[in-house]
Amino acid sequence: MKDLLNLLKNQGQVEEFDAIRIGLASPEMIRSWSFGEVKKPETINYRTFKPERDGLFCAKIFGPVKDYECLCGKYKRLKHRGVICEKCGVEVALAKVRRERMAHIELASPVAHIWFLKSLPSRIGLLMDMTLRDIERVLYFESYVVIDPGMTTLEKGQLLNDEQYFEALEEFGDDFDARMGAEAVRELLHAIDLEHEIGRLREEIPQTNSETKIKKLSKRLKLMEAFQGSGNLPEWMVLTVLPVLPPDLRPLVPLDGGRFATSDLNDLYRRVINRNNRLKRLLDLSAPDIIVRNEKRMLQEAVDALLDNGRRGRAITGSNKRPLKSLADMIKGKQGRFRQNLLGKRVDYSGRSVITVGPTLRLHQCGLPKKMALELFKPFIFGKLEMRGLATTIKAAKKMVERELPEVWDVLAEVIREHPVLLNRAPTLHRLGIQAFEPVLIEGKAIQLHPLVCAAYNADFDGDQMAVHVPLTLEAQLEARALMMSTNNILSPANGEPIIVPSQDVVLGLYYMTREAINAKGEGRVFADLQEVDRVFRAGEAALHAKIKVRINETVKDRDGSITKNTRIVDTTVGRALLFQVVPAGLPYDVVNQPMKKKAISKLINQCYRVVGLKETVIFADQLMYTGFAYSTISGVSIGVNDFVIPDEKARIIGSATDEVKEIESQYASGLVTQGEKYNKVIDLWSKANDEVSKAMMANLSKEKVIDREGKEVEQESFNSMYMMADSGARGSAAQIRQLAGMRGLMAKPDGSIIETPITANFREGLSVLQYFISTHGARKGLADTALKTANSGYLTRRLVDVAQDLVVTEIDCGTDHGLLMTPHIEGGDVVEPLGERVLGRVIARDVFKPGTEDVIVPAGTLVDEQWVEFIELNSIDEVVVRSPINCETRYGICAKCYGRDLARGHQVNIGEAVGVIAAQSIGEPGTQLTMRTFHIGGAASRTSAADSVQVKNGGMVRLHNLKQVERADGNLVAVSRSGELAIADEFGRERERYKLPYGAVISVKEGDKVEAGAIVAKWDPHTHPIVTELKGTVTFVGMEENITIKRQTDELTGLTNIEVLDVKDRPAAGKEIRPAIKMVDANGKDLYLPGTDVPAQYFLPANALVGVADGAQIGVGDVIARIPQETSKTRDITGGLPRVADLFEARRPKEASILAEVSGTIAFGKETKGKRRLVITPTDGSDPYEELIPKWRHLNVFEGEQVNRGEVISDGPSDPHDILRLLGVSALAKYIVNEIQDVYRLQGVKINDKHIETILRQMLRKVEISESGDSSFIKGDQMELTQVLVENERLAADDKFVSKFTRVLLGITKASLSTESFISAASFQETTRVLTEAAVTGKRDYLRGLKENVVVGRLIPAGTGLAYHSERKRRRDADKPLRVSASEVEAALTEALNSSGN
C-alpha cells in the first residue's frame, strides 16, 4: 500500500524550469534517449495483434501494451513492478511508458538532415561555402567532392564528375581523397575548424569593399559564431543515428474487418528500415559500387520523406494517392501540433446551445436550461447528494441524476447559487467575447442572454449559438466573478466608452418617451413632484409628450465628491419626468431633459459611471433597458409604405440636373471639354443633385405642421416612424432613408469607377430593369467583399496578437521624460479630435505652463482624467507632451506611466495587464465588423466634390504655419510652398480649425488678421497645379519649339491660344532631348536670379503643362506662368480601408512612394540620363552634394533653386514609413501611422484609442541596425533588439569604451513576430520549419517571457494573476537557494566572518 501511495505522490511532481533550449542532437544523445534499436520493419502480428519483437512496436524496447503485465503474461499485477521478464524481455510497468520511450535506428550510411540542407538559407551550404545545387549533387551521388587533396593540384571541396574522378585517379593514384554522398559532406563538416574560420572571417570583412560580399561573409560569420556559442557541432547536421518516435504517438489501431488504421509515420519508418537493412546486407556482400550507391541514395530519400515529405522532389504517397504526413507536417500549419493542440485545446465542462432574448434578466444573469445545467454541474451534484446523505455512493448519485428525481433539482439549484459560468460566442474577436454570468435555471433548451451584452458579443438572435463553460476551482470562480463578470465590463477596452449601451428597441422607447409634442393633452400643467406626474399619466389625464412644469429635488454630486441638494421647477415633458425616476441620485435633471438619442444615452451612462460608480451604473443600465422596452411597446412605432414621403422638389432637382448634363454632353460633342473633364463634371453634378434631393427629403420628413393651443399652425419635429428610428439612432441612417424616399444616386462598377448615369428612382417608386441591373453590381460586390474581408480581418488580428502578445505591464515607472507632442487633430478645417480627447487617460511627460507665463498648471507625471481635461480646455492649452508606449524604456514589457489609464477600468493600468493583446484585439475587432458592414449603402457611390477654397467656420485670428509666400501686385499672398497651413485661433489663442494650403493658393488675408465666420480666405483651382514666379520681369521661352516640344491650342469658347508642352513620347526625334523652360530676364535681357541664391530663375516645364503667357510678356511677382492638369479620384470605402491598415502595419513600401529630401539644402537639376532626371541637393552645412536619380514621369513639386528641409516632400505620392523614420525620426513616424490608421477607422465611425496603435508600433520598432560597432561584439549591419543594444552600450560606457551606433528599423508585424526572441512563439506563428531550423542551429534559449510560449508549454501566462504566480514562484526558489551549499563553503564563510569581526 505504501508503495502505491508513493507512486501516486510521484505522479504529480512537475518539473520547474525557466527556459527551454533547442539544439542539434548528437548521435550519442540520440542513443542515450533510446531504449533499444529497431531492426525490423514489422509492426504487429496480424493474428495475435501482439507487437513483433525488434519491430516498430516492440514491447521489449518500448514497454508493455497493458498496465503492469508483460507480453507473454508471466508477470501480472503491481507487485512485479520493475521486473524484466526472462522470457519476453518486457519490463513490467505502466503502459503509458509507450508514449515516452524512444528507440533508434543505426543507419548503415550517414544521411543529411533535410531541414538544414533545404530550409533557406541552407545551413550546410553556408558552413561549407558551397551552393545548394553542388551539395545536392554530392548527396544524391551525382559527383565526387574532394575531401583531402593531399599533394595534388586539386582543391578541397572541389566537385569532380565520374570522368574527372577517374582521370584524377589515373594521374595521382591515391594521393587524394574524394568521396560522394552524406559521408563526404559529414567529413567536410567535421573538418571545419570553427575558431580559425571565425578569426579569418573577422579579418576579411573590414578589407572587403563590395556590399554583397560583406553580406555573404557576415552571414557565414554569424552562423559560425552561433555554432561555436551553442555547443553544436557542424557534423551533427548529418545523421548517423535516427531517433524513433514512441509507438503510442504513432498508433496502429485495428479496425473491425481485419484492417488497420495507422499513422503515416509508420509507413515512413518502415521505408527507412527496409532500405537501411537492404543497404547493410549489400555492404556485407560487398556488392558493386553502383548498386550500393543507389541504395544509399534511396535511404537518403526515405529519411528526407520521414522528416519533411515533399520538401525535395515528389512527395511519397500512400495507398490512396495522398502524400504521407511527415514529422514536419505534424507540427506546422493550422492543423499542426502548435496551433491545433497546444494553442487551441478543447475543454471539458462545456456545452453549447442557441441563444434567445432574456429581457427580464438582470445584467449579471443569464438563463441556463435545466438539462444543460444538470450535465455541466454533475460532479458538484454528486458531491452534494453524498454530503446530504441522499446517496451512499457516487454510483447511486449517478443513478439518481439519470432518473432526474425531484431532490436532484433542489440540489442543482443550491449548487448553482453564486457559481458563475462563462458564456462565449465565436468568433471571439476581443476579450468581451467571453464574460461571466450567474446562471438562472430556466425551462426550454435555449440559453437566455441579457440584451445589453449583445453589443459586446456582437450577437443577435437570428440563430446564433453560444458556448457555456464552468470555472471549476475556487480561484477560477474568483477570477470569473472579480474580472470577467458582465457587470465589471461596462467600458470598452478599445476606447474607454460604455459598451453596455442600449440599442434598437430600447433607444427607440427612450427617445419616444423624451420627445415633446405641441398641444398634447395636459400641456401647461404644473406638478408638485414626480409621483404626481406618474399618477396623472397613469390616469390618462396627461399625454406622454405634453410640455409641463414640475418641481424636482435633485442631488448633484461634483467631481470632488461634494454633494449639493436643491429643489427647482423645470420646464420639461411628462415622459422625461417619468424617466428621471430611474436616474440614480447624484446626476442633475438636465441629463434627461432632452430627446434621448443613442449618443445622449451613451454619454449618460458614461457620466453615471464616472460620477456615481460601477454598482449604481449597472442598476441604472438595467432600469433604462426595462423602461425602454416598456415605452417602445407603448409607442407602437412601425413602418408603413406611407412613411416614405417623397419630396415634391425631387422632380425639379432631377430635371435641372438632367438639363445641365445635356449641356455638358453637347460641349463634349463639339470638343470643348475632354472625356475626363466631362466625366468629372457629370459626376459632381449628380452628387450635388443627390445631396439636394436628400436635403429636401429630410426637411420634408423631419417636420410636420400642427395646431397649437392658440389655434395657430406651427411646425414641430415629425413623429414619422422611419424618421424617429433614424433620428434616435435605433436603426437606419439618412443614407438609407435617402435610398428609400429620395434617390438611390450614383453606383460604382466592380472596379470602383462610378457609372455616369445615376439611379434617379428610389425603392418606394421602384427601379426600372436597367436601374435594377446597375444596382446589382454594388449588391454583389458587397457580399463578395464581406466573405473575403472576414478572412483578411481575422488574419490581421492574428498577426497583431502575435506581434504584441509578450507586451505586459511589468513596472510602475521607467523614468523617461520622452513622449509624443499632442495637438488637436484637425482635418479639412474641422477639429476631428480635440486635444482633451487625445490626452485623456495619458500621463503628462513635461510640465505644462499657462500660456504666456512661467506658471506650471499641470505638473509632469499627472494622469489626465476628465477633470484635468476640462481644466486644460479652460486654460486654452493647445499642445501637451504626453508619455507614450513608443518611448517607454522598460526592458521586458512596458511601464504603467507610459501606458496611462486602463481604458476598461478608468484608473491607472495595473501591473500584469496584457496591454499588447488588448491593443491587438481593439484594432482587429472592428476590422471584421467594418468589413461585414461594407454593403449597407448598397454600393451607392459617395464622392466628395473637390475642395477649391478655404471658408472659415469660426471667426478669429489668422495664423500661417510653415508657409512660404510671395505678395502679388494686388496685395494678395500666393503660397509657394507645399506643406503650408492656415489656422484660425480664438481669443484665447487656441486653434479652432486648420487647413492645408496647396502650392499656388491665393490667400486674401495676412498673419494676425481678424476674420469673420464664413469668410473665404484662400482660393485655388483643384484641377490644375500652377507654377508661380517669385520675381517680376520679362518672360523668355527656352527650347519651346512648335510641334517639336510644344503645340498651340485655340480655345473655341474664348478664342485665346494656349501652349501645351508635349509628352516626351509624343515628340519627334529632334525634341526628345530638349527641356522646354521659361526663363525670367530683366529689362536689359540679363538673367534674373532667384531671391537669395545664385541660381538663374528658370522654370522647367513638365509634360502636358499649359503655358498661359506669351514670349516676352511682362509679369509680376506671384503670377502664374503655367498650369499642370491633375487626374480624377476613386471612391473611398473601407474596402480600401482594411488592406490600407494591413499595409501600414506591415510597413510595406508603397508603389511610387513620395520622394523626400534626404538632406536640407538647395535644389538643382543635373544632367539627365535615359528616362531619369538627376536631382542634386547642395546641403546648407557645406557638406558634399547629395544626388538622386528620379524617373521622368514623376511629377516634382520643387523647382530649381528652391530651399528644402530634410524630410520635405519632393515628389507627391503615398508616404513611405521607412523614409519618415529615417529622415524625421520616431515621433514623426508615430504621428503619421497613428493618423493614417485612425483616418481609416474614423471614416467608418469606429473609435479606437491612439495608445493601442502606439503599442503595436512599439513592437514594430523593437529592432535596430548597427551602423558602427564600436567596441561591442556586434557586426555592422546586424539587426539587434533595441534593449539588448542599449544594455550593451551602458556596459561599454561604464568601462569608458566606444559604444556602438545604430539606426532604428521599422519591421512589419509579420516580420516582427518572426524575429522575436522566443522561438516557440515564432514557430507557432508562421514558417515553423525555418524558425525551428534557425533556433536549433544557434542553440537558442526561450526564456518563456511572452504569453504564447507559456500557453504552449502549459503554464500560467505571465500576465494578470499569472504574473503574481510566476514572480512568487521565482521569489520562493531564490529564497531556497542559499540552503544548497556544501559544508566546505559554510566553513569558509564562517572563518571569514570570524576574522572580519575579530579585526
From Swiss-Prot:
Zn(2+) 1 binds at residues 70, 72, 85, 88. SUPFAM superfamilies: beta and beta-prime subunits of DNA dependent RNA-polymerase. InterPro entries: DNA-dir_RpoC_beta_prime (IPR045867), DNA-dir_RpoC_beta_prime_bact (IPR012754), RNA_pol_asu (IPR000722), RNA_pol_N (IPR006592), RNA_pol_Rpb1_1 (IPR007080), RNA_pol_Rpb1_3 (IPR007066), RNA_pol_Rpb1_3_sf (IPR042102), RNA_pol_Rpb1_4 (IPR007083). One of its GO terms (biological process) is DNA-templated transcription. Zn(2+) 2 binds at residues 814, 888, 895, 898. Its EC number is 2.7.7.6. Mg(2+) binds at residues 460, 462, 464. Disulfide bonds: none annotated. Its cofactor is Mg(2+); Zn(2+). Pfam families: RNA_pol_Rpb1_1, RNA_pol_Rpb1_2, RNA_pol_Rpb1_3, RNA_pol_Rpb1_4, RNA_pol_Rpb1_5. Binds 1 Mg(2+) ion per subunit. GO terms for cellular component: DNA-directed RNA polymerase complex. Keywords: DNA-directed RNA polymerase, Magnesium, Metal-binding, Nucleotidyltransferase, Transcription, Transferase, Zinc. It comes from the Bacteria. It catalyses: RNA(n) + a ribonucleoside 5'-triphosphate = RNA(n+1) + diphosphate. One of its GO terms (molecular function) is magnesium ion binding. The keyword Transcription applies. Signal peptide: none annotated. The RNAP catalytic core consists of 2 alpha, 1 beta, 1 beta' and 1 omega subunit. When a sigma factor is associated with the core the holoenzyme is formed, which can initiate transcription. Belongs to the RNA polymerase beta' chain family. DNA-dependent RNA polymerase catalyzes the transcription of DNA into RNA using the four ribonucleoside triphosphates as substrates. PANTHER family: DNA-DIRECTED RNA POLYMERASE, DNA-DIRECTED RNA POLYMERASE SUBUNIT BETA. This is DNA-directed RNA polymerase subunit beta'.
